Every structure is written in structure tokens, then in C-alpha cells.
């Protein structure tokens, strides 16, 4: 059947004025130079396949005959039914549209793809497309209203819509020194809001070649005529395609404007380009010392029972949990058990010292909050706490503060922190981490400790984002905190000795953070999507944010698995009253400074 003369997939004589009068040899020469001939040959082969009884759809056959190959991750994230918008970056302009359709139709047949006026000329796509004109100015905008109405109807009927929100192929950016998507159109965000559709982000690797990028700089209006030419290049590479998890309407509704939603969706797509890494333990397993043997429960219990009554800070009867505050000298056996459980807990998340027990030179002069399960007779968790003025007035001065080894504090900040309690080395043992009462009870213990010492109204310390998180995830969390959670005034008063220089997003992604990621709930969704095991934002980080914590600086602790440490400061005088009541009780009144230095 290949000898049958067929209608071309894209006919040059229809695309140019007076094309029907051009000689055939000139048309063929031009079509070969523009890449249209390869499309037409592929179209003939598609028709041959259909004539031979093939049931494959146009997109699948187009990818087959144009040699478009891709490596796909996350196909299971496309919902099998219900209104859904799949948004993607647009690196190629044509081949990515064909692969886009092929991928989506592996899951569902009710697919429409929004294309520009150039792809409208690809006849095989017409049954699947909704056309918009991204180059036509005001007249095109009016004509595009028809396309907008089609999109709304399609989604309201419960179908799947594929969209490249940039509307045109990615081009070279002098600002970013790389090829990036054009601005994403906000009208797609408006449609998503009106229809209540779920959104699935997708990302294609690669970009068009030097010739196309040069045209984009010097004659952007004509570059679409050369998109087909790029397919010849695209058939020589393996494209990496990654699909993110669906974003439900309630999450999308957190954004307040179409611009914010557009930036959020673009960020979700672009973050999929960062490669996942194979995690390696902070300390090689062969180099780790065996964990020391735990102290018998009866000995620990006897030590707990010997503490003065005023050491008890919190009691949760239903969960069988008590929280005590004690000096290290009061609990020598419990201190050893704390060191053992610290090492076990931190190793489980890719941290840990690699030693048999995790104790250091700071433990003896700090106090320790201990959470004990009275029924299981086990240590459940602990927090190391230090009253800064007491430590500073001791023999080691400010060097007795744990974080002085990682951050350079100005004299001004040291003076402020005399009214603060340094907190750190927090853990809840693995067996109790899924018990919601565990963290709450530990923080109730902190609250009662503050009630006993209302003169300390600052809490500060580092919150860790371990190397078990992907580098891209840690970079995203870092960027979010830097944009939305900094105390700009006090951040000038402290510098990390080992700042996180390698944890950076691409510049165009960084620009999306201020508007596209304004809420910690949006960050939480993205972290869960980027992490292969679906883990969320570190629990302690969320807890500090709930208390109104502000970040001061960031550093890397190479001795603790390359952990990213964020130095956080909480002013209890400014913490939300409902949270203070929950953890500290209704009678807690922190004593403020005469002039608070933490307004920022």
C-alpha cells in the first residue's frame, strides 16, 4: 500500500501564500530543509499501518516512525478517570507534543491536547487537539476565546487536557545563560480554578538546537517554521520524561491568584528535571561501630524515680508518657541510654556519628528533657536544652554553646540570646515516631519548662534536613526558607562557618519561589512528590514554623552526614496564642525585652 499517493501530514503549499504555483522540485527541496518531508514520510507509514489493521493511535505511531524514544517515570501518577490537566514544560515545540499524547493515551483515551496554530497543520493530531494562537496579537486573543470555551467544556465533562502553558518552544535566556520556557500563560490557571480539575506536572528533558535558538534571538517570529526540522535531531536522542504526583484542587486553592498558581505549577514541572540520587549513608556501614548495649529498664526506671518531684514537666496519662527535665549529673545511666538511642535514631535517617554511642562534650553542662514511657519502661525521646546566660557565665563562655562551633555569632546577637534557651539533639525513637502523642507530649514538656523559667522567651537551635532528602528537595526547602522565613535583621549578625554553597536551584526556578511557593503546605506537597519514598518536611521544622520561628542562617554539618542545618529563632512573645495555650497552658506569660529585636 505504500505506493498509494496520500495527503501530506503538513503541506508546504498550504502554509505559504501562492504555494500552489511553486514548482514541485522547489517544494520538495524546501520541505526537506524544513523537516516537513520527514513528517510526510512518517505520515504515509502511519496510514500504511492503519490500512494494515493497526489499532494504535496517531501519537504512538508518530513516535514509532519518527524514532522518538523516551525513558518514562511516573506513568502511574496520571489519573485513570475524572477531570485532569497535565501541564508540562515545552522544550521542543513539536516532538514533545507527539510524545505527550503518546504518554497520556497509555492511561486514558479521552485526551485533548492544546496546540498552537503551527501544530494545527499536523492533520493526524486534529481529532485530539484544541487550537490556540500564541503569536497573533489582539485578534488572536479574541479567536482564542473559542479554544478556552472548548477547554472548559472538556474538563467539566470529566476528561483529560494536555497543556504546554508556555505556548511555544523554550528559548535561550541571556539572563539565565540557558534555554528556558517562555512565561507560562495564566489563563490556564483560571481554567483549572473554574473546573476543579486535578493537575499533574510533567517534565521533558532537552531543548532545540543552536540554529533554532539563534533564530529565537534574531527572528523569533519565524522560528516556528523550523520546528519540524528539530524532529530530526530529536529522533537521535533518548528523552527523559518524568511525571509528578497529582495535585488535588484543595491544594491548588491555597494559591490566591492565577499568577501564584501559574508559578506553582511551573515550579512543580521544573523541579522534576533534577535527577534523583542514590543515597549513601553518612558513615559507611563497614566503618560504623556496633551500637552499645542498652541499659536495663529497671536501672533507668530507678534513676527516673529518684529525681526530685519538680523535675516532672509533663504527664500524658493516656499515652503513658512522662517528660522530665534533669541535669546530666543527675542521670548518668539515662545519659548513656540517650547517647545510644540518639545514634540508633539518627542512623536510621542517614545521619549519626558512626560511633557506638552519641554523646559529646556539651552534654555534661546542658540540661536534658527526657520522655519516658511508664508502661513500656522505655526511653521514648529527648531534647538537649541549655540556658544561654548560665552557660555563657560558666568557664567556657559562649564557646560552651553547641552552635558556636558551626556559626559565628556577633556580640549583639550573643547579648540577645542570653534571654534564650538553646535546643538541640532532639529525637523520638523509631518505634514511637508514628505515635502523634509523642511529639506533642515532648513539646508540652518544653512548654512547662518555659513556665518555670518565663524570663527566657527565646528558643533557638538548628533544625536538620538530612542527606536522606534529595539534593533538589533540600535546595527547594532552603530556598523557601530564605525567601519566606528569614529574620533579615538578625541574619546579619550570624554567619555559618560552612554555608551550603552547592544547594542551589536554577535561577529561573528560584524566581518562582516568591509567588509560587508562599505557603508551607504547598512546600509540603512538593517535598512529598520529589522524594521517592514520599516523606514530608521534617517534623521539627514544621513545629518551629507553627511557633512563628524565623531563620537566621544555614550551614552544612559534614561530621553528621552532610546534614543541612537551619539556625532558627522563636520569640515566644510573638508565638500564636493558641499554640502557647496548648503547650504552655493559659497562664504562661513570657517576660519580653524592653524592645524586641526580633521584629522582621
Task: Show the residue positions of the predicted features.
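Membrane-anchoring hydrophobic helices of lipid-metabolizing enzymes
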Residues: 1-87, 97-99, 106-108, 126-127
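Non-catalytic C-terminal accessory region of glycerolipid acyltransferases
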Residues: 10-12, 141-293, 511
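Carboxylate/His-rich catalytic cores and anion/metal-binding grooves
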Residues: 108-115, 366, 372-400
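Glycine- and acidic-residue-rich phosphate-binding/metal-coordinating active-site segment common to enzymes
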Residues: 124, 131-152, 156-162, 166-195, ...
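Conserved N-terminal entry element of GNAT/NAT acetyltransferase domains
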Residues: 286-329
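Acyl-donor binding region in acyl/amide transferases
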Residues: 343, 353-356, 390-550, 555-565, ...
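A short helix-loop-beta-strand connector motif used in the catalytic cores of GNAT acetyltransferases and
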Residues: 361-370, 535-536, 561-566, 578
